[in-house]
A protein has these predicted regions:
Chain A
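FNR/FR-type flavoprotein reductase catalytic core
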Residues: 94-241
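Anionic-ligand-binding alpha/beta catalytic cores of soluble enzymes and soluble regulatory domains
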Residues: 2
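Short, basic/aromatic-enriched C-terminal tail that caps enzymatic domains
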Residues: 19, 262-280
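Local cysteine-cluster metal-coordination motifs and their immediate loop/turn environment
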Residues: 238-270
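Ferredoxin-reductase
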Residues: 7-104
Length: 280, 314, 314, 280
């Protein structure tokens, strides 16, 4: 194998400032049945982000919802010009339910930007994004960045059903070739996905692949990456306490140089080399 | 002039606020100037490399958390090569926390970590003693005495003994540590606890059980800090559930000469810096000239005589 | 048909929900029909009249409370004359909690309270043993064994031993109680804690220290209940911080055959009745036929072997 | 001494139902700088009260205020016809601060009515009320009851200053002879109060005296009661956990038959015989 591993190995501590600021909520609205979009009025200082980075949110406490730890959330959009920070989230438990109660004008304290984001190396012209469900949140700013850098983008968006597919128009506006796949139409299976990607490779070629979350997709891309010698990156999740590297609770195992090593998702990640990642 | 300093044996700290081991690292320097702190305390290290416990390593309980991080460690050499030099740039003294599974290993690590740049050694004797029945050294006066005696011979640096709440013999253990030569007590480490996910019916921690820390733990650790301050003459450093400047004040009143902040930093990463300001404001508005005047000022009257050593809940 | 019953030795309870000693009394009958409960548990009594501890006897801590009520008691005779007859009107079995300062007094009170109307005796061995060094009987296996042995000889009624969290030897104490003849364990009493008013600088409790109960205490007591259920064959009754039906389920999954509800009743006086309904709903919707199927169903895999007896926080 | 002690000794458990109900807030407004009036929309069931009784309030929890135990609060007014329950309270700590955040339409859970209220025996024609500060809250419904029963009422209302004197008009409407005393005007001292009461005794006579709270006033009335052989009652406070008699945290000491006995304020009280009470 001669895939160049990306520099996801522990870097010396980078002393980029991290901010903990209270932001006013501009909007917090349902996007479809399961997802909500949270738009914050954010100071310029925290909007110097890299796609793939995240913030650690201090969810509000109420009589019925009392989350204690912060909750990590990928940056869905950062817009220094408008002074906006966007999150796209799924209501799953106490923390995200508490987030969902926020109304316009209330404030939310966010810590960030945190972690290591995606790389788009200079010679990567044809980029492939494969996202499922809320994974779009993580990949959306990457698409914007690719667009700004004038790269060609193919976005395979997978979901349970048509109406769970979000942001297709957004990706199209960015000039991406969008390929929607759904469980309902039976198009989202791994076999079909492989066929589509291999066709793309044969057609224009793919210089780098990006994904997040799903185990099935990880395995597929690892296999394609090995076969066709294409590098890639994946954004991973793990439960977090501190979010900045102090507590070591967020580790996951990675293959590296024949060994299994633990890395902190909040610090060495959340973006890791595709081939080093281990599914769960 | 307000005097925020506090004395821990031969060490003078510029203020009584410092982090708790395992809840602090170099990365916090991205948030504020770490030199505002009274001291820096590192995550416990072991001599050899260790990977720590299985995930999930933390979970939330009502208003607090459990952790079973264990002691992942890059080992002594990496620590000396990378961590000690990092903290050299600061004036605040560096306290290194160490652990081992036997008294001999403990002592040899203690000796090898007694190097320039290290101001004091915190010994995490709340870890299991693998030579005995797996109970932590600090659960019993006898094992505490044995390990501290050896450690005392191994270093000239100040030795801080970090106690465990998983014992019915807090004051006896405190006295054993003092007698064996500890220079200060850190009171305390986390309390063994558990949570189960009722949907999956699996323990919420990969390690089955873990240590409770955060606000829920405060009244317990405060009680221990008070008991220790009343029963030994060496300084007591309070630790457990401290989340606000009021909590800091409560521990100082109870008799702690300094405090360590753990879990609160996860929720509010600037909290230690804010507590220093808050303490200053409190002392000024209350007319105190120094932290010293506040320490141990609890108005416990006669009650203290009979009650200090009570270790059964009433 | 859903089977809510649970078996505690020779006693069958119609459901696993009962009050904790000291947080229940006849007055609660003004709120709901007490016969919905699995059992009735009285406040600990002593033979002689006692007035209890100085006030303030309770204080609030973040999301929980401390108490130092002590054991005010109208004495054995008043109890037999007034309290036992009151509970006679109910089908639910009456569990009487007793305490004394020495094994002999304990045993003689146990004998004298073994009268018709009493279904079982809960022995509050978390109280100080005045013959030893004032540590509670239940802090050590030896004193636990000694007192339970005597009590076992003093009565034919089922004996429930109520343990204390103020020990580093939970499983050893549990085994000692089993070996000495206890029919069940109640796990557990409150955990020694403290709070200081930073304005007056006085302890918030008249008694200086008191016992932590309520939600903050849950992960600790749950851990103990789990450890006990794994280490003894007699039934374990879980107690500590149970405030919602989810908490009840968590304890049952951990291995408790029944639970006691304490502090939660102060906040929501109907909570026990609601928990019974909630448990029924849960079992039905999850497809369980009985409470028994839920008890001890924790998915702890291999983890349990190595870890159950771990009593040091990691 | 031949004052007939009132039957405040422990009565056998009375099995009057106690309710725990959620009530909508009708109003919650400042009365003056220190006090607030809370008006609840209450079901008829909980409005069968006796003056002097109290409710145990489950204060709301928010991000910044997290009271855990309930808070006891005297009934300031109960109006079965309007379906209203009134509390007059002083914001002192976490619980009452949380109460103060309640807005119209929100709900509050209240447990009650609780405890033993005041007695107005058939042959008590001339009643004296002595209240200071928030003590008025407790004595107000007693004044209304006395009015309904056609008794003569003298109300001595003491406070720090003129503007802290509340409800004087309310007492006057009930036909009471209202005597306001303030620290500011130097009229509230014990000596002056004694002179006023003794004048009243000499003039129309007093059959019973009622008060609450203040130690100074307790001592004064005890002394007057003994001298002039006038019975009386006092409403007392103590910290409470359960509020209904289970936990025994709310005890206070009383003199009875030459002995000191502990009674539960929530159960045997909060109203006790004046002579048996011990100040603190
Ligand atoms: C780097 C990163 C980026 C993420 N970005 C997004 C995003 O853009 N949109 C989105 O909807 N979700 C995202 N997640 C997942 C999100 O953090 C969890 O859904 C959220 O923490 C759940 O909290 P809860 O209280 O609602 O759920 P609960 O299940 O009640 O949470 C209980 C605990 O588990 C943790 N937890 C639960 N699920 C996850 C998870 N998947 N990852 C990490 N911790 C978890 C919680 O933080 C909390 O500590 C991200 C996670 C990580 C690590
Ligand atoms: C029977 C009874 C009737 C009362 N009626 C009124 C009333 O009508 N209006 C009014 O303003 N206040 C009344 N009080 C006092 C009121 O209960 C307290 O002011 C209130 O509990 C303070 O709570 P906090 O959280 O705001 O204060 P904090 O001081 O923060 O309270 C801390 C703890 O102390 C308790 N506590 C503090 N002060 C008192 C007190 N005086 N009595 C009992 N417990 C206290 C609280 O309940 C809480 O548990 C009454 C008290 C009792 C016992
Ligand atoms: C995530 C985490 C990791 C910890 N690691 C260590 C450790 O390595 N060594 C140690 O002595 N204590 C460790 N502790 C315990 C803390 O230092 C502290 O004693 C405890 O958390 C109580 O303080 P707190 O309530 O302020 O967090 C750890 C605590 C947490 C929450
Ligand atoms: C006010 C109060 C009084 C108590 N009195 C007793 C008692 O007399 N005997 C006893 O064995 N336990 C007593 N307990 C302990 C409880 O029975 C129970 O073990 C403990 O409160 C933990 O349960 P919880 O968290 O559900 O309250 C008391 C607890 C409280 C809060
Ligand atoms: S969350 Fe603390 S190290 Fe990653
Ligand atoms: S408050 Fe519980 S007995 Fe009075």
């Amino acid at each position: 194998m001669n895939i160049v591993p990306l520099p996801t190995s522990p870097t010396p501590i980078e002393m980029m400032p991290v901010f903990d600021v209270s932001c006013a909520v501009k909007r917090n609205e349902p996007v479809n049945g399961e997802y909500r979009l949270l738009v914050l009025d954010a100071p310029h200082s925290i909007l110097q982000c890299t796609p793939g980075q995240f913030f650690h949110l201090l969810c509000p406490v109420s009589e019925h919802l009392q989350p204690y730890l912060r909750r990590p959330m990928s940056i869905y959009g950062y817009y220094p010009d408008q002074g906006e920070l966007h999150f796209l989230y799924k209501v799953t438990g106490e923390g995200t339910s508490a987030l969902a109660t926020l109304t316009t004008g209330q404030s939310l304290t966010v810590l960030g930007p945190l972690g290591r984001g995606f790389d788009i190396l200079p010679d990567w012209q044809n980029l492939l994004l494969v996202a499922r469900g809320v994974g779009l949140a993580t990949l959306a700013p990457l698409a914007l960045q690719a667009h700004k850098l004038g790269r060609n983008l193919t976005a395979i968006c997978s979901a349970r059903s048509e109406d769970m597919l979000m942001s297709l128009d957004y990706f199209r506006e960015l000039g991406a070739d969008v390929i929607p796949l759904t469980d309902d139409t039976g198009t989202s299976d791994v076999g079909n996905m492989r066929r589509i990607i291999e066709a793309k490779i044969a057609d224009t070629g793919i210089d780098a692949m990006y994904t997040c979350g799903s185990n099935r997709i990880l395995k597929l891309l690892q296999s394609l990456g090995k076969t066709h010698n294409i590098p890639g990156q994946i954004a991973l999740e793990q439960q977090m306490a501190c979010g900045i590297g102090m507590c070591q609770c967020c580790v996951r195992a990675f293959h590296r140089k024949g060994k299994t090593v633990n890395e902190r998702v909040c610090r060495e990640g959340p973006v890791f080399d595709l081939q080093e990642a281990i599914g769960c | 002039m307000l005097d925020l300093t506090t004395q821990i044996g031969s060490l003078t700290l510029k203020n009584p606020i410092m982090p708790a081991s395992g809840t602090f690292s170099e990365e916090l320097a991205q948030l504020f100037d770490l030199d505002v702190l009274g001291a820096h305390v590192t995550k416990t290290i072991t001599r050899e490399k260790r990977s720590g416990n299985p995930t999930p390593r933390v979970c939330e309980v009502r208003g607090s958390m459990l952790n079973s991080i264990g002691i992942p460690s890059k080992g002594l050499d990496a620590f000396k090569a990378n961590v000690i030099p990092f903290y050299d740039r600061y004036d605040a003294p560096l306290i290194v926390s160490i652990s081992a599974g036997s008294t001999d290993e403990f002592a040899s690590l203690c000796e090898d970590i007694s190097v320039p740049g290290v101001a004091a050694i915190e010994v995490n004797i709340s870890c299991p003693n693998i030579e005995e029945d797996g109970k932590a050294f600090a659960m019993r006066p006898s094992t505490t005495h044995a390990v501290i005696t050896k450690l005392r011979q191994a270093t000239d640096l100040p030795l801080w003994a970090k106690l465990t709440p998983n014992t019915g013999e807090t004051t006896e253990v405190a006295k054993a540590a003092e007698e064996a030569g500890a220079d200060a007590l850190v009171v305390s480490n986390t309390l063994l606890a558990m949570a189960i996910d009722i949907h999956t019916r699996r323990p919420k921690l990969g390690n089955l059980m873990g240590g409770l820390s955060g606000p829920a733990f405060k009244p317990i650790a405060l009680r221990m800090a008070y008991q220790c301050a009343k029963s030994v003459d060496i300084p007591v450093i309070g630790c457990g559930g401290i989340s606000t400047v009021d909590d800091v004040i409560e521990y100082l009143i109870a008799g702690a000469v300094a405090v360590q902040i753990g879990t609160a930093t996860f929720i509010e990463p600037h909290i230690m810096a804010r507590m220093i300001d808050g303490l200053e404001t409190y002392l000024t508005t209350q007319g105190f000239q120094s932290v010293r005047q506040l320490v141990g000022s609890v108005d416990d009257k006669e009650a203290s005589d009979g009650m200090v050593f009570m270790e059964a809940a009433p």
